[in-house]
Amino acid sequence: MTNILRVKCAVIGDAAIGKTALIQVFLHDRSYFPKNYSMTTGVTLSVGKVNIPDTKDAVELYLYDCSGKEVYLDLVQELWADAPLAIIMFDTCNEPSFQHVSTWASRLSKNSTCGPKIGVLVGMKADLKERRRVSTREGQEMAERIGFHYLESSAKEAEGVQEPFFYLASQWHKTHNEKGELQDDVL
């Protein structure tokens, strides 16, 4: 019998940095990349399942893809308040999006109703090395400051796409396995 943990995960960051693209490529097993940009208005909910290796367990991630536009901020902050997991993203070719990471982390922490988040900071567009403005080291240092794990990804090249989701699912599973709570859901 498979144990399935269900958990809410907020995906946040500035507009037009690749949040939706990363989710879509992950959900379609790296076989689909959205060719045209379509701004997320408010929040889009997607569900992705991660099987935990060497177990019969799986984690269903309820991915709240939150718009990075200020006009939707009040709405999205309410929706991510009770999300135990979070992905904060920035564009490695866009230094202002990186500078805004600490603001996103502060908003996430300030509006949390479920304590500290398990999180990943993801540097997007890692394939565009010639246009890069933020180094891997800078990303790692920022992740350390906000208490998150750091990864880089390219949704377009389907590189590093699964890792953020597998990391969060594994950490969530580990937390619940240690507590003996594998039948509990957190939505």
Task: Go through the PLM ranges and name each one.
Residues M1-D184:
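TRAFAC-class small GTPase G-domain
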